[in-house]
Amino acid sequence: MSSRTIVPSLFASRESYRRDAEAIELPASAGKPMSISYSELADLVHQVRAQLASWQLPKGTVVCSSLVNSLEFVVVFLATADLGLVAAPLNPNYKESEVTFYLEDTKTPALIVPAGTLSGTDASEGALAAKRAADALSVRVVEIVYGAKTLQLVDANGASTPSADATEASEDDTALILHTSGTTGRPKAVPLTHKNLLTSMHNIKLTYSLSPSDKTFLVMPLFHVH
């Protein structure tokens, strides 16, 4: 990744500082405990970015996902944003009708789901509901499959072939779309640029005096505004 002022560039900067520093730790309670270094995270993001590039989506296209907090979630977001696409993470517990609304609202051509969703094996009801909604709208359903420090995007036609032909994001490009809760009406999309996210992250770092030696414990769902 380059030194561009976009969200994924933070990890490139940290990677050059210390490639073997731990970036993500998944505890045993996560189901598949593991530790991922910044170097390994960068490699995974490059892998998924190259596969997304093979889809040849125009810059600014929204790519939805329905994933729980996981390594896959983090990599999909970073790869999508780095490519100049827009990540739109959905609550993995949404009902089919709710997923339908968000797919239609974002006009996404693709929905990324957990491994096992296409076959229906070892898939949550939320993942299956997301697939049904996507199928009804002819939205491409793609699994994100982890194995031996690799991540593969797989749909009904097989695995995506990596491509080097790709666009790049800038700080004023939208990186993320979140939706309001809709408690007083229909949920509304809230676009956040790379610059918005970087500013927020910088403020959090200053507020809590965070340093490279600190570790944060994530308990909130990544798809939510926080």
Mark where each language-model region is.
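A short N-terminal helical cap/helix-turn-helix that marks the beginning
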Residues: 2-25, 43
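Conserved structural elements of the adenylate-forming
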Residues: 42-47, 171, 190-211, 216-220
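Conserved pre-ATP/AMP-binding loop-to-beta segment of ANL
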Residues: 19-22, 159-179, 185-186, 209-215
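ANL superfamily adenylate-forming
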Residues: 30, 34, 116-171
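Short beta-strand->loop structural element characteristic of the AMP-binding/adenylate-forming
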Residues: 64-66, 73, 77, 81-112, ...
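Conserved AMP-binding A3 loop
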Residues: 35-39, 168, 175-202
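Conserved ATP-dependent adenylate/AMP-binding module captured primarily in the ANL superfamily
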Residues: 94-129, 200-217
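Conserved AMP-binding/adenylate-forming core of the ANL superfamily
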Residues: 23-78, 95-100, 168, 192-194
